[in-house]
């Protein structure tokens, strides 16, 4: 992680950690950098960069700032307007853009925002290019073998254009519809759009596939994104599914790159369940290349043991769909993801895609002719407790001798019946304390003891 960009982009409270000037300068650098790359290869056409945004009030401000920077540096800015992160990746790859930018802070509250950078292949931007962006933000850029106090502006006809590209978003919707192998006619499907990016996309996809689609939290006002809604507040969808006799419910986050499910009984279906359900189906259909499912260190022990029982290999990466995708690409894997609902189907997408994930879960339900509850009940999840402690210094809090002592004590109590994972958040000032164990009471006790030690040592904010 860099000074500004974490595991999922440059994120912070709007006009505090992340300002309009930051966005303008990110645009200035990217417009110049891709133009310079072209010029050095004998191509004097303007770079083309596609931009999407979520429904936060500040997203419009950051969009204008990015466009100002891009066009001032000679790049053409193509605007998808309010759309999902995976749609930006899709359009960047399909339409040959130099890169893509998504303005979103994902599942964070409305007052936060972020800038996610996507390369021309629809993948998250490489760390070397991000390091150059950060160097320019800090005013000491070394690039192309030169030191730049400032990068040049475009002039006259070289100033970039701004292009309305809502058709790109529409092509993404059409692509999702084309992936539907089954009619959903007769199915009652509930969608929680988190008052975010999926509000005007997800229903269109399910309606086109014949579902009776019931939608909640699809009235964004700029201030209500993720507020008691979406994949991080799934209780409302659980109640809605049961009360409205739905077959299944799907909850997306603010930029719809993740999805969690609710079965017909109102039970939450996590990313681990989705990996198990889809992994088993893909093995049966011969689609699971390498016979491997890629998860992260946060995935439940129950998932790994269930996959092993099915004869499916598993791999663990660091937390972050970026790392999952990197492993999948290097090892030619087709399915990977996170417990939080970032699920990657690499045959169809280069990033986590919540709407695609919901379609794939429906595909398994239709193919197996089973309810989601029946499919999920074959996976036994170990009790898991997660406590997020907001801290002054993430690294120092983790390294504290007393905290390390508390971690070792918990590991001794658990033995081989559970595990402890303490890690820093990649996007927020948090230390995440996670404990799993067969015994739920012991799990909760160990987790609270570690979290309390962090607080007692004075690290908590």
Regions found by a protein language model. Name each.
Residues 13, 113-241:
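Gly/Ser/Thr-enriched, mixed-charge loops and adjacent short helices
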Residues 248, 285-461:
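Phosphate-binding and adjacent anionic-ligand microenvironments
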Residues 131-173, 178, 264-337, 344-345:
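Proline/glycine-rich low-complexity loops and linkers
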Residues 40, 48-112, 204-262:
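N-terminal small/polar loop signature for handling phosphorylated ligands or for N-terminal nucleophile
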Residues 5-6, 51, 77-82, 102-103, ...:
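General beta-strand structural signal in soluble alpha/beta enzymes
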Residues 52-54, 191-193, 263, 347, ...:
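Short glycine-centered, acidic/aromatic-flanked micro-motifs in structured strand/loop junctions
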Residues 1-68, 72-73, 162-189, 395, ...:
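An N-terminal, well-structured beta->alpha segment
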